[in-house]
Amino acid sequence: CGWTGIYVSKDKTKDMIWPDMIWIYVLAYDLWNFAYTYNCISDHSVYCGLILLLSCTIPTFFIKKGAWLQHRAQTLALWIMFVMTVPSFADRLAPVPTTHNKTAFFIVSFLSLAVNLIAVIYQFSLARKNKRNILKDEIYVDTNAYKQVMKENL
């Protein structure tokens, strides 16, 4: 959605702000990413899935709205640097094994798929209703979430 809408905040932090990345996108992405890590590297999903996603999502909702993309890049970079420096952390030093239950894998994946489909349908219907191009226009400019991000960061 409208990558041209990304800008640098005007405050002293100079954060990268993407106001069109509202809560629905963040939650849909988080669910998709957790489902991926849970299904593909399940014994690491607590660290590289849940905790890593929460570390960028919590600040987005409670500290700096609109900066999720920057928070994600920073936390992912820190995690990768840490895990490359201490590769045995997730496997031997502090393992958190999962059940490897196929039903749990399916439920997490199905929930992720359902939420992401709802997000896509919402995004396309909003774009169509407001005659916006999803590749270059900001889609959510009329939403309260978008307006709040703009108000806090301009």
Pin down the residues of each PLM region:
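Generic multipass alpha-helical transmembrane bundles of integral membrane proteins
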Residues: 1-67
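C-terminal transmembrane-bundle signature of multipass membrane proteins
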Residues: 48-153
